[in-house]
Amino acid sequence: MALVAGIGQLDAVVQGGHSATPRPATGPAGPAAHSGRHQYDPDAWWARATGDSREAGGLGRTLAAASVAGQQQRHGALLESAVTVVRPALLWNDTRRPGAAADLIQELGGADKWAEAVGIVPVASLTLTNSGWLARHEPANAAKVAAICLPHDWLTWKLSGS
């Protein structure tokens, strides 16, 4: 079974051991966008992934292998625990945090300091910037975060049970 996780859609493909024809299922991953807010609920995405996989014939039977791939959109599922999502994940194009990258750059002493320290200068679309925005604007949610996973990593974690 293969899951390909994109922001606009999620694809599941299952191929039987003796079958030469993949059975795909494709559907929207469910991002919510309004008033500059672009986010998705990872639990809804998981429901879509498992639904697509069942439709393609991949869940409900023994699998020999599973592969999860994803497009790097620089956002993360914020987790309180392995099963509890803190809030919908901010997408790269969410416009609520235009100053968050500038704030982070200033806190470390400028772009050159960032480049020297970690090899990258924060931009608004990075998970790091999302985390800074969350700490400033939703401190109660930020305090709950125990882990951050990119979407395809979160799906792999959910599929593996660990």
Curated annotation (Swiss-Prot):
Q: Which organism is it from?
A: Actinoplanes sp. (strain ATCC 31351 / 3876) (Ampullariella sp.)
Give the GO terms filed under biological process for this record: D-xylose metabolic process
Q: Where is the composition biased (Low complexity)?
A: 20-33
The annotated region (Disordered) lies at: 16-39
In UniProt terms, what function does this protein have? Catalyzes the phosphorylation of D-xylulose to D-xylulose 5-phosphate.
Recorded protein name is Xylulose kinase
Q: Which family does it belong to?
A: Belongs to the FGGY kinase family.
- The organism's place on the tree of life at top rank: Bacteria
